[in-house]
């Protein structure tokens, strides 16, 4: 009878461990969504602050000779720098170890 109780104890422990793994996976997914939403909101906040600053100024900034990105490409660049893909194939997914993506850089810095 002792072996049966030991076996039943292991089965119960296994069920609890599996449930805990499911909960951890759900928490991980929630955390990823929260981080992505946070990055989006930070970029939106930055964009709104820039827009407000432009409205408050009477004159426009002039380019200093370098290539100036449009607002939409600046937003894509910000997302990319935050660690997210902006290319059509992987849009919104996190870049693994912030590795560069040729597709993303082509979208941001390539010619129209």
From Swiss-Prot:
Pfam families: YabA. Keywords: Cytoplasm, DNA replication, DNA replication inhibitor, Metal-binding, Zinc. One of its GO terms (cellular component) is nucleoid. One of its GO terms (biological process) is DNA replication. Zn(2+) binds at residues 85, 87, 101, 104. It comes from the Bacteria. The gene is yabA. This is Replication initiation control protein YabA. It comes from Lacticaseibacillus paracasei (strain ATCC 334 / BCRC 17002 / CCUG 31169 / CIP 107868 / KCTC 3260 / NRRL B-441). Belongs to the YabA family. Involved in control of chromosome replication initiation. Inhibits the cooperative binding of DnaA to the oriC region, thus negatively regulating initiation of chromosome replication. Inhibits the ability of DnaA-ATP to form a helix on DNA; does not disassemble preformed DnaA-DNA helices. Decreases the residence time of DnaA on the chromosome at its binding sites (oriC, replication forks and promoter-binding sites). Tethers DnaA to the replication machinery via the DNA polymerase beta sliding clamp subunit (dnaN).
